Every structure is written in C-alpha cells, then in structure tokens.
C-alpha cells in the first residue's frame, strides 16, 4: 500500500491550483500580491494537517458508526468516539449525493424525491449547491469529497488571514503565524467537515475587502469585495456569513483612514454588500422563503433564557445556565479535556466548545497586544474576540437585550466564535510583532505573557500544556537574541500545539463501512421500488432518515432543521415522529396508521425489538435476523384521486390526522378551498408519463361512473407542499392546495387529459434577475475602474 495515493494527490493539486488562481485574482483585485511565503505555507498547511488521510487507507468520514446503523454489516472492532459527527452521514453527504445525481442528470437540483418526503436541495444552504469550494470538491469521488473540501478550506483561510494581517500593518512572520493559528485552530477544525467552515474560510477575505473599501474605495475593490461577499453567502451557512459580515464591518470601521471620510467608505461597503447579495440572490431568496415555516425557526423563536439566581461574586451566574464554560475555550488546548479522547467536560459537545481555541501562540500575542501595544488598529480585533466569547457564553445582560428581538433568537451564537478566533489570531499578530522586534520589551509585555500563561494553566495544567508554555517562553527568549530564529521557534511551538490538536477532530473511517451495500439493503431497495412513486422507511430508529436516500430509496422522514413545521406536525400526529432542536432524534411509531399508506411506503425495516405490526407483512423468512423486512400491502402511489374529501380548518389538521382511518379519504383546508367542493367517488389513478424530481406529467383517466363525472376533482399527492409547486393543464394554471395539511393537492377541472406539476424554488426567477443586474454592474466596475492602489508596505517586514 503506497504511503500517498498518487491519483488523489494529483487531482487535489490540480483543483488547488484552480482555487489558488482565484485567490491570486482576489488579492490583485484588492490591490495586493500574495507573497511567495504565503502561497507556499498555504499549500503546506493542508499537506501537514491531512497527510494521514492522503494515503487513502482511511477515509475522512465518521463512517464507523454505520456498523450498527446498516443492517447486515459484518461485525468488526470500531471506535465510536466520533459518533457526535453523525450529521455528516445523515445530512451532509446524502445532500451532496442528491446534488451530484441531479447534475449528472443534467438538471439543476431544485427538488429531490428521495430526501425528507421531498425537499429542495437548492433552497437548503448546507447542501452547498452553489458553494464555490464544494463545487471544486465535486471533482473527487464522494468518499474523498470531505478531504478535498477541507484542503481547499485550509488554502483559502490561510491566505485570506495572511492578507488581512498584512493589511493591518503586521510583519511577515507574525502574519504567517496568525494565518497558521486560524487555519489550524478551532475556528476551522472544530467543525472541519461541515459547511459552516466553507463559509468561515471566506471571512478574512471579506474583512480585507471591507478594510480596503474604508481606506481607498474604488470600482475594482467594490467588484472584488462583492464577489467575496457572494462566495461567503453561497458557502452554506447564513448565520456564519452574518457573523462574518459583522466582523468585517468592525474591521472596516476600526481601521478606516480618518482622512478618507466615514461616509465614502461606508457607501462603498454598502454598494459591495448589495452587489454581493444580488449575485447570491438565486440561492438566498428561496432560502429566505422557506425559513419562516421551518422547524428551526419555530423551535428557536420559542426558546427562553435560564432563570438561575444571579450573584456578582459567582461569575458563572453572569451567563445563561450551561454556557459559561465557553469563555474558557481560547485558554488551553485541553480546557475540556483532550478532544475526542478524554471524557468531555465542556458545554454541549466537542465541536461547539473548542471553536474558540486558536493556539497558545495567538493567545500569548493577544495578551501582549492588550497590555503593551499602543496601536488603535489592534482594538477592533481585541474587542470582537471578547464580544464573540460573551455572545457564545450568553452573557446575560447582552443576551436579554438580544432576546427582546425575536428574530435574534434564531442564530446559534456559538458560531460567532469562528470569526472570534480569527480576530484573536490577528490581534495576536500585533503582540507577536512586538515580541519579534529588536526593541526592548516593556514590562507590560512580560506581564501579558505571564498573565496568559497563568490563566491557561489555571484551566488545565497537564504536562503537555506546561511543556508548550515552557517552549513558548524559550522561543520568546530566543527572539530577543535573534528575531528570525525566534520566529521559527514560535512557528515550531505553534505546529507542535495545533497539528496534533487539530488532527484529533478528524475521524479515520474504515472504507469498508462507507455506506456498505449489504444483502439486506439490496432486498430493501428492491422492495421499496421506484423512488419517484414509492417510499421506504425504518421502524423506530432503524435506517435513520436520509440514510436510505444514499441507496436510492425515497424516505418520508425528515432530518433537516429546515423541514417544514406543518409537515412535522402531521408526522407527529400519525407516528409520534417529533424531532426538535433539543431532541434531535425521534423514533417512528404506530406504523399501522393509515398515513403510511397515504405516503406510499412499500417497505419498512424492522427488528425483533420493535413492537409487532398488525398490517405489515414480514417477507424476509427470518434470514436477516435480528432485523426483519416488512411489506406494506396497501400503499398508494405518489398521486391519486381520493375516495372522499373532508374540509377542515387549519387548526384541526393534527386532530384529523390522528383520527384518520382511510388513506383514500383526505382533507383540504377551509381557508384555501373556500366554498369549493370536489366531486367524490372512486377514480382510476393517473398514469405518470414523466416522473422526474420536481417535474411530473400525468395522464388523467376519465372519471369513473361514481366519481361525479363532469365536475372538478381533487388530485391528491403525497408530495410535501412547498410554495414553489405549480400545476398546469390545458394551457392554464391550476390552483394548488394543501391536502392533509402538508401535501400538494391540485384542483383539477373536468376535461384535461394531462396535468403537469412543476417545482421552481420560490424567488428563483427574481433572484436570477438580481444576479444578472449585479453581475453586469460588477463587470462594469472591473472594466471602468482603475487598479486598486497598492497598500503601503514597510521595508524589512
């Protein structure tokens, strides 16, 4: 087995060259050149951090947990230390696969039949349909997608942070140390495999662009910053983009040239932001359309702050209950134990709690900057780093102020620690410049170093942390004698600190457990049938949602914070399936409910520990024990004509679904139907002429004798309702209603023999128009504007 997978490495080098060209162009657009040292170190960072995975013997995927999640996998020894990263297997990779399937079919991923009863990957930011880095990583097989994507994130984040530090006047060595601290620290590695870090990698670039706009605004800088803004907004995590925008605004305001005038810089930044939003509008507008009705919005808008007693003498009481420990994250690599190795003793989980750690070198530099550097340019970074900690820890005076505005309850404020870690690294560069200078260090600098070490060791005084501080102190002493050697010594301390620490966040998955296709899965997929018409599911927690989509089976169960709340209420009433933001996983129960027939579920995964069903039939003959394969004998196709139609109010949906006895008897909402009532009676089901995700053409048979021939009928479907669905027949649009409170229904007039259903993400057309206008304006800026004036550089730095 070779030490390095040559094919993987060559492909990675080619894709990184393309991304490097983009970074070079962005830097030129901002009036800078990327130094050779920044380019070389930006390439070395992913190679150093990811070498164990480049051989291809282990996957950068936590797939070992599938040993118990997929029936029929041969037993082997695996580690479950990375099971907290289960969203990678149940959300991120299934969404990515659906995007790849759509692109392979030469269609845009507007809709997926397999995911969550039907959903739109386009409107889901974390699917990363238009994420620049995810698009580049699609050159790799799906099992290496996360590895390639992380390498690209490291490249972009490193060079962007170097550029930001240089724009603040930092020296070459301290800028490289700041870039290494951010790209190898918790700001990137705590959530290394998630879309959130694809967004945060662009934050230093945005901050650099905004600083340039406040200092020397020009057309090319505006266009370049707009492109960076669009890349950030398209990268899969809107709340991180919002926090990154706040950080960039703080940088621009704090580092502006007073002679340039606030109004001019603010105006240029506003124009760049508007153009960036316009470029990203084809994705942003559909996302904003679905957010208000999502599970995430409903759960977070109702959350409250803790009511524990407050005491001035007890600092943990200054924060919301359970959040105070977030303030410790920058202080030690082992503030909550060794990541994924020791028992966890921090807030919530490893990824959330460790986000704020940027290394002891950055911490020491930040304390030196705080106490000994009299440079106003350091203030925005120091202030933002502190504020990000207070937001993540829910400092009660600040939290109560935010909670007065309901929409401000929605963001996960722990994500603010990512730009906070970036701020800490750049602030640390100010202190490192002083430590690496030939000037005599003031006493305040030594006090800053001592204070940083004391606080860090008060949090965790293990042998490794003590050794790191001893080496850091020795590096500072070397820097007093030979600054260049001191810089190299600090780099060695940083790598010794962060490389093993960052690698501890990365799973080493067994390739044989990457979505294994077992005989049970093969039999299940055959029984479930065509995903355009039929579905499968797992009883209780079996074959958890989105897992089946990887094997080509449509599943009605959502596992997505953007799932429509109305759909989840229907599933709760029928099956007790009620995932929330606090209770993330939920079982499916009561599989004898008629809604299972309505949803077109043909195959169900069961086990000997699941309560027996009265309606489902075991068809496996016991050959998959302890698992069972169950058949539903009476599923309805995805579209049908109901036997009877009830009219109910919107507030009666859950009660009606809970009392449902016949899948062919459906309900429509009185608020939508008004006085209209469809003709009833049996009718043959429509025949699909085309059944592509998001586009269905049905041949409508003549109404049966008892179906009220000549009257309007209701075409019922089990497609999850969304604003983007439309219907046409005979050259005219048809009204689309909700059936059973959460599914698409069509008011079908008498006469048409064909009906067409199509999904277009709501806001997509308007977004495309906005993108076209913004793109034209950006091109005009690039063609008409002069090259950005280069920022002044100091010799010898």
Model-assigned labels for residue ranges:
Residues 95-102, 112-141, 326, 331-341, ...:
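Short hydrophobic/aromatic helix or loop-helix immediately within or flanking a transmembrane segment
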Residues 117, 127-131, 135-159, 192-198, ...:
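Loop-to-helix entry region of an early transmembrane alpha helix in multi-pass inner-membrane enzymes
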Residues 2, 66-103, 107-109, 278-371, ...:
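Periplasmic/ER-lumenal interhelical loops and adjacent helix-loop junctions
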Residues 47-57, 103, 136-144, 173-194, ...:
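Membrane-interface helix-loop junctions at the exits of transmembrane helices
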Residues 1-32, 195, 201, 213-230, ...:
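Contiguous transmembrane helix-bundle modules in multi-pass membrane proteins
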Residues 68-69, 297-306, 463, 498-684:
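Extracytoplasmic
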Residues 42, 158-168, 172-257, 268-287, ...:
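Membrane-embedded helix bundles of polyisoprenyl
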Residues 602, 625, 663-793:
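Active-site-proximal, structured, solvent-exposed surfaces of multi-pass membrane proteins
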């Amino acid at each position: 087995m070779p030490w390095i997978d040559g094919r993987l490495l060559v492909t990675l080098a080619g894709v990184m060259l393309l991304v490097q060209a983009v970074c070079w162009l962005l830097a030129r657009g901002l009036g800078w050149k990327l130094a050779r040292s920044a380019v070389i170190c930006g390439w070395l960072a992913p190679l150093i951090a990811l070498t164990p995975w480049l051989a291809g013997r282990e996957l950068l995927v936590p797939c070992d947990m599938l040993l118990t999640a997929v029936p029929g996998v041969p037993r082997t020894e695996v580690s479950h230390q990375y099971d907290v990263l289960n969203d990678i297997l149940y959300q991120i990779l299934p969404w990515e696969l659906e995007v790849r399937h759509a692109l392979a079919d030469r269609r845009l991923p507007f809709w997926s039949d397999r995911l969550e009863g039907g959903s739109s990957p386009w409107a889901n930011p974390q699917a990363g349909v238009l994420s620049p880095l995810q698009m580049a990583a699609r050159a790799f097989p799906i099992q290496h997608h996360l590895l390639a994507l992380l390498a690209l994130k490291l490249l972009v984040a490193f060079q962007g942070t170097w550029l930001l530090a240089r724009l603040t006047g930092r020296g070459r060595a301290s800028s490289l140390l700041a870039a290494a601290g951010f790209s190898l620290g918790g700001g990137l590695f705590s959530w290394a495999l998630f879309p959130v870090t694809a967004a945060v990698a662009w934050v230093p670039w945005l901050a650099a662009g905004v600083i340039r706009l406040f200092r020397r605004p020009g057309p090319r800088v505006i266009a370049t910053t707009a492109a960076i803004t669009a890349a950030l907004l398209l990268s899969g995590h809107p709340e991180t983009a919002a926090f990154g925008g706040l950080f960039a605004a703080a940088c621009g305001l704090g580092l502006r040239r007073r002679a340039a005038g606030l109004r001019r810089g603010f105006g240029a930044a506003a124009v760049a932001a508007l153009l960036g939003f316009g470029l990203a509008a084809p994705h942003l507008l559909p996302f904003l359309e679905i957010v208000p009705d999502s599970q995430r919005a409903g759960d977070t808008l109702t959350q409250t702050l803790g009511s524990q007693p407050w005491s001035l003498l007890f600092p943990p009481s200054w924060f919301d209950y359970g959040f105070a420990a977030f303030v410790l994250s920058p202080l030690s690599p082992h503030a909550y134990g060794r990541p994924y190795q020791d028992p966890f003793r921090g807030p919530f989980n490893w990824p959330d709690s460790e986000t704020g750690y940027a290394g002891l070198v950055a911490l020491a530099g930040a304390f030196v900057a705080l106490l000994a550097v009299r440079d106003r340019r350091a203030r925005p970074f120091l202030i933002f780093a502190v504020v990000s900690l207070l937001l993540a820890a829910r400092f009660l005076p600040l939290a109560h102020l935010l909670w007065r505005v309901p929409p401000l309850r929605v963001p996960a404020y722990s994500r603010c620690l990512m730009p906070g870690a970036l701020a800490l690294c750049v602030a640390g560069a100010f202190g490192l410049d002083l430590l690496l200078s030939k000037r005599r260090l003031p006493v305040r600098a030594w006090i800053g170093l001592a204070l940083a070490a004391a606080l860090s060791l008060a949090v965790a005084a293990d042998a490794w942390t003590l050794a790191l501080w001893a080496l850091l102190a020795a590096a500072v002493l070397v820097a007093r004698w030979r600054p260049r050697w001191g810089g190299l010594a600090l780099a060695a301390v940083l790598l010794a600190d962060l490389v093993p620490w960052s690698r501890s966040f990365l799973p080493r998955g067994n390739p044989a457990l990457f979505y294994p296709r077992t005989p049970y899965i093969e039999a299940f997929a055959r029984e479930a049938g065509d995903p355009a018409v039929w579905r499968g599911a797992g009883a209780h927690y079996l074959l958890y949602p989105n897992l089946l989509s990887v094997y080509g089976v449509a599943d009605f169960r959502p596992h997505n914070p953007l799932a429509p709340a109305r759909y989840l209420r229907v599933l709760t009433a029928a099956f007790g399936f009620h995932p929330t933001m606090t209770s993330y996983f939920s079982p499916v129960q009561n599989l004898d409910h008629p809604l299972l027939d309505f949803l077109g579920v043909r195959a169900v995964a069961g086990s000997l520990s699941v309560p027996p069903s009265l309606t489902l039939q075991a068809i496996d003959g016991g050959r998959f024990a302890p698992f069972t394969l169950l058949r539903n004998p009476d599923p309805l196709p995805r579209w049908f004509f109901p036997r009877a139609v009830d009219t109910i109010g919107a507030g009666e949906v859950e009660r009606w679904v809970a009392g449902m006895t016949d899948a062919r008897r459906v309900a429509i909402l009185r608020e939508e139907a008004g006085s209209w009532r469809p003709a009833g009676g049996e009718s043959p089901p429509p025949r699909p002429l085309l059944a592509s995700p998001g586009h269905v053409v049905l041949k409508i048979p003549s109404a049966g004798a008892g179906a009220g021939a000549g009257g309007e009928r209701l075409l019922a479907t089990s497609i999850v309702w969304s604003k983007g669905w439309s219907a046409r027949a005979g050259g005219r649009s048809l009204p689309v209603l909700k059936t059973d409170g959460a599914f698409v229904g069509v008011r079908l007039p008498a006469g048409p023999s064909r009906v067409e259903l199509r999904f277009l993400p709501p806001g997509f057309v308007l977004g495309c128009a906005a993108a076209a206008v913004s793109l034209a304006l950006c091109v005009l800026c690039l063609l008409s504007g002069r090259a950005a004036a280069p920022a002044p550089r100091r010799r010898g730095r």
